[in-house]
Amino acid sequence: MDYNRNEKVGLVRSRMQGEMKMDENVRIEGKQIVLRPITLEDTPLIVRWRSDPRVYGTLFRQEPITEERHRQWLREMVLSGKCDQFIIVDKAQNRPVGTVFLKEIDREHLRAEYAIFIGEETARGRGIGSEAARLMTDYGFQQLGLNRIYLYVFASNARAIASYRSAGFREEGRLRENYRCKDGNFADVLMMSILRSEWLEKRTAEQCVSGC
């Protein structure tokens, strides 16, 4: 993960001064993708993605959203500092393909919930989700100082589960028939997490493989 030094300093300074909102200038660069902070101008894009049944069918809110509902999310979650949300930009195509975020940021217990969706069909199955998960866990532990990042995923979503595992998330438990789907059936949900100690161990091992 590549943080511009000035951007990193600005982010840390803003938090030290008591500002809890995400620095709008931060950029996180990986091999395939760049993560940039979400803006109000992204609203039509988010609404288009969230209106696709192939997208919202994997989410816990299985319905399209309106622009007003998304703007409400930005006001109540992102601008309030409860959520740090990024747009995933595909470097090869130089276009947005999805969004990723840490929400319910708890600054007392140093934990947050991870979530992601890929909106563009051409970006699926290319490892972009796995890379986004790795970049966001780096961001959460390095920049936010978190101790734990957790997520919820449908037990039937094998592709997402494999992606989370590759980023270091471990299964904590299975919530049986925890979610009632639109068709009336109940679905099991997995809870997964990664701890700071596990992230450090994984990062050390990866650095050793590439540099030892």
Features from the language model and the residues they span:
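Conserved GNAT acetyl-CoA-binding A-motif
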Residues: 142-152
